[in-house]
């Protein structure tokens, strides 16, 4: 049955990788694989429990003074195997939901209108770097999908030329993905590592700073040659928000400070309380929500308030991303609980000598070019457990301990690989749908540049680890 569950996951990966051909939504595929996998796991629960959780199951029977029956096994799986994976997935989903709602509140109140003012230029190069820099900085604080769609919406309203929109949109995509990979709150992969204790926020960002900058700056600089000297723009009136009077500048600045500043405080909140980061995100959301209602109390009872809406493409993208993350975590969870990953590592000799970290990273990067980078990352993260401080194996191989090299390399490589064809991320799919781009055009004009930047960033990561002896996190 382990082989059947693994086959379902592999077929799901094939459908996810060929979404642009089959037109089957990857979120639906991930959810189907996760639910069917757990149903099969429960149906053959006795085999899995005795092979993977025998000690825990014996303790469960002893404490409950119960006999081992099929019902008892199912109850044990439900409470002790299934629910922990639901909790891990819920931590990521609730964090994403909170941060995306924060973005919606800020955007509806015009807190990002300053970006449109920065884009008032006819210089194509200035437009390119303004879009790229603003996107990179925003994606450091917010998730990359939300940042990508928000910036694409702004850019789409300003630039009428489809070809120029494709180039600028690609620059936005690269900046959002590279910026999101720089922090633990910038994309789901970083959140998974942070929640599992594989990395800490400060060390993770310091380690990937130079590689992410290289992966972003090099292809963006190469894209300058694709643009004319001047860019055609169309300027429209600032968006109507339900009332002729908008929030004052200081009110928008305060809301922006509460939202973005609160997100930056979440790592500190986590370090102090040891509670899950999603609780900190919900706390920030609640404070921002209260401030929003205080500032907009005069509009709350007006029919015009209904006009404050988020673009439909953002709403759809948010729902798709949340469901996809939930489905993939459940699918990978059932495969891990079946023992398939342990068998694979034993087959590769993982019980004695772990495979090379850099080969793992390169393999993850190659897979993420066609397979979703989150799905790829989840599989490679699940191959190894985080080595604790008291574990003797940490001295022999610290690459898999907290802030170990393995987690950094895989996180970086899946980001870099996802930029090559554009289909490796949900953000890339959003860009292709909005601008009707083809994968072939993307690779010929953007993908190979992203590959050059990604390889350069990986070389920088290798050099920094080699020169620092892999001990950079001990000095921070």
What are these regions (language model features)?
Residues 1, 21-26, 53-56, 74-92, ...:
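Interfacial loop-to-helix junctions that mark the boundaries of transmembrane helices
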Residues 1-8, 87-98, 140-148, 208-216, ...:
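Structural signature of hydrophobic alpha-helical transmembrane segments
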Residues 3-13, 23-71, 89-101, 252-262, ...:
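Hydrophobic mid-bilayer segments of alpha-helices in multi-pass membrane transport proteins
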Residues 4-6, 162-166, 170, 182-183, ...:
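Juxtamembrane and boundary regions of transmembrane helices in multi-pass small-molecule transporters
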Residues 6, 28-32, 93, 128-133, ...:
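Hydrophobic alpha-helical transmembrane segments
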Residues 26-35, 117-130, 164-174, 317-319, ...:
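Cytoplasmic-side transmembrane-helix entry/capping segments in multi-pass membrane proteins
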Residues 37-48, 85-87, 138-175, 179, ...:
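Membrane-interfacial helix-loop connectors
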Residues 56-67, 87, 104, 109, ...:
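Transmembrane helical segments that form the transport core of multi-pass membrane transport proteins
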């Amino acid at each position: 049955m382990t082989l059947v569950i693994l086959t379902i996951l592999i077929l799901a990966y094939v459908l996810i990788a060929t979404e642009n051909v089959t037109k089957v939504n990857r979120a639906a595929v991930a959810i189907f694989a996760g639910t069917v996998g757990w149903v099969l796991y429960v149906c053959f629960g006795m085999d899995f429990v005795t092979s993977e959780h025998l000690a825990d199951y014996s303790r469960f029977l002893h404490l409950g003074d119960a006999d081992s029956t099929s019902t008892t096994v199912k109850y044990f799986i439900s409470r002790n195997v299934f629910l922990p994976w639901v909790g891990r997935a819920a931590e990521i989903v609730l964090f994403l939901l909170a941060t995306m709602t924060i973005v919606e509140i800020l955007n509806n109140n015009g807190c990002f209108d300053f970006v449109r003012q920065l884009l008032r230029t006819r210089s194509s190069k200035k437009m390119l770097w303004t879009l790229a820099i603003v996107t990179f900085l925003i994606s450091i604080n917010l998730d990359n999908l939300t940042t990508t769609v928000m910036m694409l919406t702004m850019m789409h309203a300003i630039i009428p030329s489809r070809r120029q929109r494709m180039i600028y949109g690609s620059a936005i995509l690269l900046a959002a993905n590279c910026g999101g990979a720089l922090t633990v709150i910038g994309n789901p992969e970083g959140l998974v590592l942070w929640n599992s204790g594989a990395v800490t926020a400060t060390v993770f960002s310091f380690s990937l700073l130079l590689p992410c900058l290289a992966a972003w700056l090099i292809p963006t600089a190469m894209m300058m040659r694709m643009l004319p000297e001047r860019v055609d723009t169309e300027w429209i009136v600032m968006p109507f928000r339900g009332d002729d009077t908008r929030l004052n500048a200081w009110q928008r600045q305060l809301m922006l400070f509460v939202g973005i500043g609160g997100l930056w405080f979440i790592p500190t909140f986590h370090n102090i309380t040891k509670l899950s980061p999603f609780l900190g995100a919900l706390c920030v959301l609640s404070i921002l929500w209260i401030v929003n209602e205080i500032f907009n109390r005069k509009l709350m009872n007006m029919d015009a308030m209904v006009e404050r809406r988020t673009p439909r493409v953002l709403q759809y993208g948010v729902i798709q991303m949340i469901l996809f993350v939930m489905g993939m975590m459940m699918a990978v969870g059932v495969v891990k609980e079946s023992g398939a990953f342990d068998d694979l590592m034993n087959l590769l000799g993982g019980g004695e000598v772990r495979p090379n970290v850099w080969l793992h990273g390169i393999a993850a990067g190659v897979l993420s070019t066609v397979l979703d980078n989150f799905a790829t990352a989840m599989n490679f993260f699940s191959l190894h457990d985080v080595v604790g401080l008291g574990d003797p194996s940490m001295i022999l191989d610290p690459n898999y301990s907290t802030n170990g090299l393995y987690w950094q390399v895989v996180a970086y490589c899946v980001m870099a690989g996802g930029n090559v064809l554009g289909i490796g991320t949900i953000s890339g799919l959003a860009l292709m749908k909005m601008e009707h781009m083809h994968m072939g055009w993307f690779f010929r004009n953007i993908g190979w540049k992203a590959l050059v930047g990604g390889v350069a960033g990986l070389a920088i990561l290798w050099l920094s680890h080699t020169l620092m002896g892999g001990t950079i996190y001990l000095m921070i």
